[in-house]
Curated annotation (Swiss-Prot):
GO terms for molecular function: chromatin binding; mRNA binding. It comes from Saccharomyces cerevisiae (strain ATCC 204508 / S288c) (Baker's yeast). GO terms for biological process: deadenylation-dependent decapping of nuclear-transcribed mRNA; mRNA processing; nuclear-transcribed mRNA catabolic process, deadenylation-dependent decay. InterPro entries: Lsm1 (IPR034104), LSM_dom_sf (IPR010920), PTHR15588 (IPR044642), Sm (IPR047575), Sm_dom_euk/arc (IPR001163). Present with 3490 molecules/cell in log phase SD medium. Keywords: Cytoplasm, mRNA processing, Nucleus, Ribonucleoprotein, RNA-binding. This is LSM1-LSM7 complex subunit LSM1.
Length: 172
């Protein structure tokens, strides 16, 4: 096949594509805008949060803040510069502990969302910071108390034939 016939074949293919209205390639920025218009119900919804600071609430009630570096189809997450925080809003206190790089299994994620880094510290300015160990012990006591209350409630409801599904790992 000669060079001229190859050029003609290529021109014919280009003309056919234009006639069939093949979409032109879009830039990465346009793709982000296009994808942001859709609500995903899968882990694909997380893609726009990569390399951004996020908040993650775990099933055991822990709250983690960090930069999302990667994730997989099971919503397993890798956070960098991760910080765990415990809030006691009634007493207007909080505690935090650096966790570094943190891997989270997707089955433990209750909720996640992006953090506005410009406003992140505003609520903390009005709160008193306490030692993390003290806060963790207080949280453990509160969780144990809640577990006993929920177990009692479950037994009471079971006597009336109502199933009450509460697990110790569901402290959120």
């Amino acid at each position: 096949m000669s060079a001229n016939s190859k050029d003609r074949n290529q021109s014919n293919q280009d003309a056919k594509r234009q006639q069939q209205n093949f979409p032109k390639k879009i830039s990465e920025g346009e793709a982000d805008l296009y994808l942001d218009q859709y609500n995903f119900t899968t882990t694909a919804a997380i893609v726009s949060s990569v390399d951004r600071k996020i908040f993650v609430l775990l099933r055991d009630g822990r709250m983690l803040f960090g930069v999302l570096r990667t994730f997989d189809q099971y919503a397993n997450l890798i956070l960098q510069d991760c910080v765990e925080r415990i809030y006691f809003s009634e007493e207007n206190k909080y505690a935090e502990e650096d966790r570094g790089i943190f891997m989270i299994r997707g089955e433990n994620v209750v909720m996640l969302g992006e953090v506005d880094i410009d406003k992140e510290d505003q609520p903390l300015e009005a709160m008193e910071r306490i030692p993390f160990k003290e806060a963790w012990l207080t949280k453990q006591k509160n969780d144990e108390k809640r577990f006993k209350e929920e177990t009692h409630k479950g037994k009471k409801m079971a006597r009336h034939g109502i199933v009450y599904d509460f697990h110790k790992s569901d402290m959120y």
